[in-house]
């Protein structure tokens, strides 16, 4: 893959690089997020446990996906559009290549093997660090482990490994929901309690909250999702084209060898 800037290819500044990474990972959209101390564990009812087990079973069925993604975001009155190739592989690998009008990648972001790398081909700059809840909170402003990223782009919800609390909440306009509190953040999941299909996911971490609403066609196939955060200071849509699952992606599809002269900086 060639990382040089082509003729007419848009220049991506450090600010735009960070903004684009916010877009492609869909849920890191609000600044000022902090990670609270884990809450104490609480007993979980049998009904809630059945719902959790259903989510786990569906999550464990996820393999990989490949799709073209059209991303539109409005942030503080500013609009941004990206189109690119999105790859995801369970349990925790995601790659997005934003394409220029000429079809060349100008921004590449990869979460793989516990590392987070965002590279701008236009400026030859990269931001790298461990892909943990803390580092994604610093870069993406919301604490998301790699498995949560894969779950979101795949249309699922992955219950926290370190589950502290779980309860079924009374129905609202969207129906009943499941509240799951882990060591890092809280998830509220609106789902079909018979099939386990997730309709909407709210992720609450620190002072930030993001809501992901999945879009599916008449046959139930995932077509993308909408996202809002910061009391709708940020809103966005992600629409998939030619989505394929079970394509047999391997680790090589998520390898990103930076140019030797690339400027790198750690996630702060």
Positions of predicted regions on the chain:
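Sec-dependent bacterial lipoprotein signal peptides
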Residues: 1-33
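Hydrophobic lipid-interacting interfaces of membrane-associated proteins
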Residues: 70-76, 101-104, 119, 185-187, ...
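Gly/Pro-enriched, hydrophobic low-complexity segments
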Residues: 165-268
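N-terminal leader/targeting segments and the immediate start of mature chains
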Residues: 33-81, 260-268
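Edge/loop elements at the starts and ends of beta-strands within beta-rich repeat scaffolds
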Residues: 57-65, 77-80, 87-92, 109, ...
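An acidic-aromatic
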Residues: 92-148
């Amino acid at each position: 893959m060639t990382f040089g800037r082509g003729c007419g290819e848009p220049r991506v500044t450090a600010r735009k690089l960070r903004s684009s990474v916010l877009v492609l990972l869909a849920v890191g959209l609000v600044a000022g997020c902090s990670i609270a101390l884990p809450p104490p564990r609480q007993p979980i009812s049998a009904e809630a446990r059945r719902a959790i087990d259903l989510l786990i079973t569906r999550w464990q069925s996820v393999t990989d996906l490949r799709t073209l993604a059209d991303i539109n975001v409005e942030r503080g009155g500013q609009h941004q559009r990206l189109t690119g190739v999105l790859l995801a592989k369970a349990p925790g690998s995601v790659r997005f290549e934003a394409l220029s009008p000429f079809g060349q990648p100008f921004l590449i972001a990869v979460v793989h093997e516990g590392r987070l790398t965002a590279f701008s081909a236009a400026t030859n700059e990269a931001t790298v660090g461990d892909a943990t809840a803390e580092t994604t909170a610093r870069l993406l402003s919301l604490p998301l482990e790699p498995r949560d990223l894969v779950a979101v782009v795949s249309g699922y919800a992955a219950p926290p490994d370190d589950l502290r609390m779980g309860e079924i909440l009374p129905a609202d306009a969207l129906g009943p929901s499941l509240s799951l509190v882990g060591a890092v953040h809280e998830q509220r999941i609106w789902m079909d309690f018979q099939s386990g299909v997730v309709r909407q996911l709210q992720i609450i971490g620190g002072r930030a909250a993001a809501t992901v609403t999945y879009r599916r066609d008449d046959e139930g196939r995932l077509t993308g999702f909408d996202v809002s955060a910061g009391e709708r200071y940020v809103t966005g849509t992600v629409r998939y084209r030619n989505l394929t699952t079970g394509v047999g992606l391997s680790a090589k599809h998520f390898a990103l060898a930076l140019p030797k002269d690339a400027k790198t900086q750690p996630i702060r």
